């Protein structure tokens, strides 16, 4: 390869080169002087006297040499390229950061909008549930009022029915007595027709004495219109009872088939209806109210126990695992205890019978008209 030809230098370049050459000469002169001094110290006091100082002096002189001579043209070009690459990288990073800074508020606004929509929807659902619960509570109150009204009407019906039965029984007795009296009078008339004419003069006295009770029986009996009125009232009361029973059964079906009714409220309503049925039955039959059995009490809380089993358990602490030497025996014992109640609860679940469905309140059988 041919040696590069030196390009003509400008005056400024020449002056700078002269200054650089003089600075380099000064550095070299300083290095020679320091070298001779250090060698003299080493000859006088031994080589170990300046062993720690020599590397530092050499490093400082090399730095002064580089600064005095200046970088080569190739190194300047490489450093300029590196600076351009670094500048381009910094510009790209700055642009990316600006884009992220501009897109950050938009994403936050979108997230806030979504959160607001979710909260509004949940608020609407809660309001709908509250309205539904209020409506259900109003329906249960109306059902309780209808039950009370049914009890009152049932008691009035029982009193009226007892009065009608006594009246009908008395009327039947009077009708029977009247029929007996009519049969006796007809029999006496036949006997009088068969007897001779001589005995006819004595018979009217006896006939007047015997049928003398007929007008009293006739006066004490009910007329046909009164009996019709009594039977009509009884039929109307039976119709009212039937309508109330149908309405009560409708409300019971609505409450039992609705899946949105909470299980606790439904179970409480079942227990209340069972109590009302026992009260109505005791009032209708005139017997003392039956005491609640243990099966009913256990069945009423069966739903609560199932709900508690569905609740997730609190996770146990794992700190004791780090002290396994001391807590190993205690952790094995609860595991055995938890496995045993699980099997016992399964056996109890298989043995518990299913609860019967509720039926509408029974009414007393009315006598046939």
Swiss-Prot record:
<feature type="modified residue" description="Phosphothreonine">
    <location>
        <position position="287"/>
    </location>
</feature>
<dbReference type="GO" id="GO:0005739">
    <property type="term" value="C:mitochondrion"/>
</dbReference>
<dbReference type="GO" id="GO:0032509">
    <property type="term" value="P:endosome transport via multivesicular body sorting pathway"/>
</dbReference>
<dbReference type="GO" id="GO:0005765">
    <property type="term" value="C:lysosomal membrane"/>
</dbReference>
<keyword id="KW-0597">Phosphoprotein</keyword>
<keyword id="KW-0967">Endosome</keyword>
<dbReference type="InterPro" id="IPR034743">
    <property type="entry name" value="RH1"/>
</dbReference>
<dbReference type="Pfam" id="PF11461">
    <property type="entry name" value="RILP"/>
</dbReference>
<feature type="region of interest" description="Disordered">
    <location>
        <begin position="173"/>
        <end position="219"/>
    </location>
</feature>
<dbReference type="GO" id="GO:0031902">
    <property type="term" value="C:late endosome membrane"/>
</dbReference>
<feature type="region of interest" description="Necessary for interaction with RAB7A and RAB34 and lysosomal distribution and morphology">
    <location>
        <begin position="251"/>
        <end position="312"/>
    </location>
</feature>
<dbReference type="GO" id="GO:0031267">
    <property type="term" value="F:small GTPase binding"/>
</dbReference>
<dbReference type="GO" id="GO:0051959">
    <property type="term" value="F:dynein light intermediate chain binding"/>
</dbReference>
<dbReference type="Pfam" id="PF09744">
    <property type="entry name" value="RH1"/>
</dbReference>
<dbReference type="GO" id="GO:0032991">
    <property type="term" value="C:protein-containing complex"/>
</dbReference>
<feature type="compositionally biased region" description="Polar residues">
    <location>
        <begin position="337"/>
        <end position="361"/>
    </location>
</feature>
<dbReference type="GO" id="GO:0070676">
    <property type="term" value="P:intralumenal vesicle formation"/>
</dbReference>
<dbReference type="GO" id="GO:0030670">
    <property type="term" value="C:phagocytic vesicle membrane"/>
</dbReference>
<feature type="domain" description="RH2">
    <location>
        <begin position="219"/>
        <end position="295"/>
    </location>
</feature>
<comment type="function">
    <text>Rab effector playing a role in late endocytic transport to degradative compartments. Involved in the regulation of lysosomal morphology and distribution. Induces recruitment of dynein-dynactin motor complexes to Rab7A-containing late endosome and lysosome compartments. Promotes centripetal migration of phagosomes and the fusion of phagosomes with the late endosomes and lysosomes.</text>
</comment>
<feature type="domain" description="RH1">
    <location>
        <begin position="10"/>
        <end position="100"/>
    </location>
</feature>
<keyword id="KW-0968">Cytoplasmic vesicle</keyword>
<keyword id="KW-0458">Lysosome</keyword>
<feature type="region of interest" description="Disordered">
    <location>
        <begin position="332"/>
        <end position="369"/>
    </location>
</feature>
<keyword id="KW-0472">Membrane</keyword>
<dbReference type="GO" id="GO:0008333">
    <property type="term" value="P:endosome to lysosome transport"/>
</dbReference>
<dbReference type="GO" id="GO:0015031">
    <property type="term" value="P:protein transport"/>
</dbReference>
<dbReference type="InterPro" id="IPR034744">
    <property type="entry name" value="RH2"/>
</dbReference>
<keyword id="KW-0653">Protein transport</keyword>
<dbReference type="InterPro" id="IPR051241">
    <property type="entry name" value="DZIP_RILPL"/>
</dbReference>
<dbReference type="GO" id="GO:0042177">
    <property type="term" value="P:negative regulation of protein catabolic process"/>
</dbReference>
<dbReference type="InterPro" id="IPR021563">
    <property type="entry name" value="RILP_dimer"/>
</dbReference>
<dbReference type="GO" id="GO:0045022">
    <property type="term" value="P:early endosome to late endosome transport"/>
</dbReference>
<comment type="subunit">
    <text>Homodimer. Interacts with RAB7A. Interacts with RAB34. Identified in a complex with MREG and DCTN1; interacts directly with MREG. Interacts with CLN3. Interacts with FLCN; the interaction is direct and promotes association between RILP and RAB34.</text>
</comment>
<feature type="modified residue" description="Phosphoserine">
    <location>
        <position position="294"/>
    </location>
</feature>
<feature type="coiled-coil region">
    <location>
        <begin position="74"/>
        <end position="177"/>
    </location>
</feature>
<keyword id="KW-0813">Transport</keyword>
<dbReference type="GO" id="GO:0045732">
    <property type="term" value="P:positive regulation of protein catabolic process"/>
</dbReference>
<dbReference type="GO" id="GO:0046983">
    <property type="term" value="F:protein dimerization activity"/>
</dbReference>
<feature type="modified residue" description="Phosphoserine">
    <location>
        <position position="293"/>
    </location>
</feature>
<protein>
    <recommendedName>
        <fullName>Rab-interacting lysosomal protein</fullName>
    </recommendedName>
</protein>
<keyword id="KW-0175">Coiled coil</keyword>
